[in-house]
Amino acid sequence: MTLKVSDIGEKELVKYIIANSKKITPDDTAVTPFLDLNLISTCDMLIQSRHFPKNMSYFDMGFKAVTVNVSDLAAMGAEPLGFLLSIAIPKDLEVDSFKQIIDGVFKACDYYSIPLIG
């Protein structure tokens, strides 16, 4: 039997993210001192059936989720200071698929040299 995310629950999923990130804290918020600079935030919600080709891997979906937000910041001439992840997943998603998404997020954060901060 394949383990589903509904089998382990949200707390275990969050534990996986925290345990595998170099910069994340268990807080729900991140505070970045910015002095006289402007802090620009962005958040794009991507929907599997709308924003991803049917044959795109879960890893690539995670990578794209970071990339589209970095692109929005670049369009404004801003440098990303960190990435806040917001994800909605079906309760019957396989845990391995969830981990592939998150691994794609981690890889993109490494690629763009930005920490996953929450």
Language-model-derived ranges and their functions:
Residues M1-S57, M76, L85, K107-C109, ...:
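Extreme N-terminal cap/leader segments of soluble proteins
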Residues K22-K23, P53-V68, D92-D103:
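Glycine-rich anion/phosphate-binding loops
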Residues V70-G118:
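A glycine-rich phosphate/pyrophosphate-binding beta-strand-loop-alpha-helix module
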Residues A30-T32, T67-S71:
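Short amphipathic alpha-helices and their capping/turn segments at secondary-structure boundaries
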